[in-house]
């Protein structure tokens, strides 16, 4: 049986929008520009300026709806500006980009992404994380191919809120730990072997360049350390996602994530936690849950040191999650919609998962008390 894999192309730099026409014009002349409100305010003018003097025609800025939901995808699909376009430019953060993936796939249009945050790998992955309109996780949409090209404008990313890069570091540094756990004791074929190997390349750049990248973004300055972190978050982590997930008939596998992301989805049912804390922030605490579940105490101690240095969460209090909410969280983690559940080589009950959360919290409080 044949197997195909679509991988992304990318451009990064303060002037990378100069490359837009080069990589898009072969797909047509009309682009629907869809994204978040703030992202469109920051990027639309720069995109339009880069395409001035070409035959590319941009739509007016189109708000994606504010949530990565199928309802918003349907709303966008019904718009004439979207239906009449040859391609879609997805501008903004993960939820805006993921909504556009569904729209582009359903309408059969080429998709180009313009991340304005260094917070996640959505800009170069085929999958889309979809939610109900109220923000509770619904499912993962598996697209057949990645976006055609990802344009990461360093100046625009540098002007974004620092907490998004901070959260992106917390999210992407999970790749090595999660893919190792998910693939442990498995016999891997070519592509997932590549993916789990590339996952190891996420960790060092984020640990080495993360502190300096945070200094730069707080100062609203572009720089090589910021670029290295953005590349690790958007591209390296994205490549891992593309190479560790397959829904191709006869070639299904999933080694992309495990307990840390299961914790994130679990936390979406806790209103205060979900409302006030980002995806990456919760995944970072989920890494501690993973290590507690795996009883990997030495790794947990080392990650606590990094998390503390980056001000990532170490306790339930840090993420506004209450102990009485844990049974509902564990039930959500074990829901069939959460494909990360069970991506470990041993039996885990909902009670075990809740206990691992409590253990991570306990050890976090002990770590802080020891300082």
Give, region by region, the residue ranges found by the protein language model.
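A glycine/threonine-rich phosphate-anchoring loop and its flanking beta-alpha core
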Residues: 8, 105-202
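Short glycine/serine/threonine-rich phosphate/pyrophosphate-binding segments
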Residues: 17, 40-44, 95-102, 120-124
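Active-site segments that bind and position negatively charged phosphate/pyrophosphate groups
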Residues: 189-306
């Amino acid at each position: 049986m044949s197997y195909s894999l679509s991988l992304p192309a990318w451009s990064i730099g303060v002037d990378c929008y100069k490359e837009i026409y080069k990589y898009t014009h072969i797909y047509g002349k009309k682009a629907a520009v869809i994204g978040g409100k703030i992202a469109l305010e920051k990027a639309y003018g720069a995109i339009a300026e880069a395409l001035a003097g070409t035959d590319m025609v941009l739509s007016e800025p189109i708000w994606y709806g504010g949530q990565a939901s199928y309802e918003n995808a349907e709303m966008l699909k019904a718009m004439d500006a979207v239906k009449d376009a040859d391609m879609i430019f997805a501008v903004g953060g993960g939820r805006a980009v993921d909504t556009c993936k569904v729209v582009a796939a359903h309408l059969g249009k080429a998709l180009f992404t313009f991340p304005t945050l260094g917070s996640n790998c959505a800009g170069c992955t085929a999958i889309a994380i979809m939610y109900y309109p109220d923000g509770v996780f619904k499912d993962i949409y598996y697209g057949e191919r990645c976006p055609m090209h990802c344009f990461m404008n360093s100046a625009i990313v540098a002007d974004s809120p620092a907490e998004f890069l901070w959260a992106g570091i917390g999210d992407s540094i999970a790749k090595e730990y999660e893919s190792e756990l998910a693939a442990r004791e498995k016999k891997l074929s070519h592509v997932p072997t590549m993916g789990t190997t590339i996952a190891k390349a996420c960790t060092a750049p984020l640990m080495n360049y993360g502190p300096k990248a945070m200094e730069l973004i707080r100062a609203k300055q572009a720089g090589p350390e910021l670029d290295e972190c953005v590349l690790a978050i958007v591209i390296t982590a994205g490549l891992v996602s593309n190479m560790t997930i397959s829904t191709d008939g006869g070639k299904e596998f999933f080694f992309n994530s495990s307990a840390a992301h299961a914790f994130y989805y679990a936390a979406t049912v806790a209103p205060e936690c979900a409302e006030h804390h980002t995806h990456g922030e919760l995944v970072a605490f989920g890494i501690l849950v993973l290590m507690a579940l795996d009883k990997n105490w030495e790794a947990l101690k080392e990650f606590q040191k990094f998390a503390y240095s980056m001000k990532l969460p170490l306790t339930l209090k840090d993420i506004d999650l209450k102990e009485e909410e844990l049974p509902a969280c564990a039930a959500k983690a074990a829901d069939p919609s959460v494909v990360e559940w069970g991506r470990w080589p041993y039996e885990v009950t909902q009670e075990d998962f809740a206990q691992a959360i409590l253990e991570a919290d306990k050890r976090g409080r002990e770590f802080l008390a020891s300082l």
